């Protein structure tokens, strides 16, 4: 996806402008409503094992935050569909609210500063290798999520 995708995740263009640009780019004659409905298909299921780990970390006194590249279309959908995510996190940082997106170094630096975290005391998980590299460049321990066992396997060693 092109620059309109990145602009949308930074909150720089409206949902309607994004839908129009993407439909034009992909030669899809969709209405805004059709596009919006299809755009939510990316959400397939909650990961209860990860939610449980997040709760356990918080019970142990760790701060758990989520950093997500997202957009207004998704933020009107997933909080209602998956309230467990918000309940399991101390804070959720969204690219569209911050005006920056992963893998830009400044987004990781922003979260570190806002949370009072040092890179060496932070662990970051993502399923995108570019985002892992971006976090690594600011000194954050970063784990590429390859499948549903990556996060539970990592914390099985740490939490036991």
Q: PLM features: residue spans?
A:
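Anion (oxyanion) recognition and catalysis
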Residues: 58-59, 136
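Structured helix-beta-strand junction loops
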Residues: 60-61, 88
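A generic secondary-structure signal
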Residues: 25, 53-56, 114, 157
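N-terminal helical cap/lid subdomain that shapes the substrate entry/recognition surface
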Residues: 1-52, 59-60, 71-75
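Phosphate-binding loop of NTP-binding sites
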Residues: 66
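A generic structural motif
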Residues: 61-63, 140
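Asp-based, Mg2+/Mn2+-dependent phosphohydrolase catalytic module
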Residues: 71-72, 76-160
């Amino acid at each position: 996806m092109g620059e309109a995708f990145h602009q949308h995740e930074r909150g720089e263009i409206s949902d309607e402008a994004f839908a129009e640009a993407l439909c034009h780019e992909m030669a899809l004659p969709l209405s805004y409503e059709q596009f919006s409905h299809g755009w939510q298909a990316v959400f397939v299921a909650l990961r209860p094992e990860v939610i449980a780990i997040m709760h356990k970390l918080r019970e142990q006194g760790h701060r758990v935050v989520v950093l997500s590249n997202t957009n207004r279309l998704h933020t009107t959908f997933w909080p209602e569909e998956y309230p467990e995510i918000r309940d399991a996190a101390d804070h959720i940082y969204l690219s569209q609210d911050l005006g920056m997106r992963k893998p830009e170094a400044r987004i990781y630096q922003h979260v570190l500063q806002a949370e009072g975290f040092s890179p060496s005391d932070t662990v970051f998980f993502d399923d995108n290798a570019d985002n892992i590299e971006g976090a690594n460049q600011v000194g954050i321990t970063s784990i590429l999520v390859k499948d549903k066992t990556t996060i539970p396997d990592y914390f099985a060693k740490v939490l036991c």
